[in-house]
Amino acid sequence: MDIKKMLWETCAEFHGHECGGLTIGYKAALYVVELMKLQQEATGCVSADEELVCVAENESCSVDAIRVILGCTEDKGNLMFHLTNQQAFTVFNRKTRESIRIVLKARPEGITRENSFAYYQSKEPAELFDVTPVKMDLPERINLNESFTCSCCGETAGSNWIRFVDGKPLCLDCLAEQEETN
């Protein structure tokens, strides 16, 4: 099977349906792979770890294709959001220090939301996106926080979400409950 077809099917399966928004992210990710000359694993994924970082400027369907193809996720700390509600993606390669920002061009007049899927599917990535100057610095690597067990509920949370009261760790939910009763 053709790698692009396999990637599309994987994106659609992950996302749950096919739509214009997913197509935008799919084409954006393919364009980033092409422009940055990135190597894909057999699965099609580019970034098995944190070497690639994507800053998405929207929280739309398009981001699911970024997750699948570029391997950028919030949990790994290499997918971040700078919300401008634009279909724009800034991608950094930690190994090469290269970065790129691509922005979706305006839809031609007459293309509706309903027929946008066919429109975006029919275009090559270079026809859909402008490459613009990168507007930000490479984000720092994710800071993995120490975990603590809440002395009240027994659940574990990272140090950013724990408060110490009388020397005992409390998760934010238990802290809020305790403050309500006091």
How does the language model describe each region?
Residues N78-G110:
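C-terminal edge-of-domain segments
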Residues S159-F164, T181-N182:
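Short Cys/His-rich "knuckle" micro-motifs
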Residues G44-C45, E50-V91:
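A structural-propensity feature for long, helix-poor, extended segments
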Residues R97-I100, L104-T149:
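C-terminal binding/interaction regions
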Residues M1-F14, C153:
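Short, hydrophobic/aliphatic alpha-helical segments
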Residues F14-A29:
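Conserved phosphate/anionic-ligand binding catalytic regions in large, soluble enzymes, centered on
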Residues V165-E177:
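Cysteine-rich micro-motifs
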Residues C150-G154, C171-C174:
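Short cysteine-rich clusters marking metal-coordination/redox-active sites
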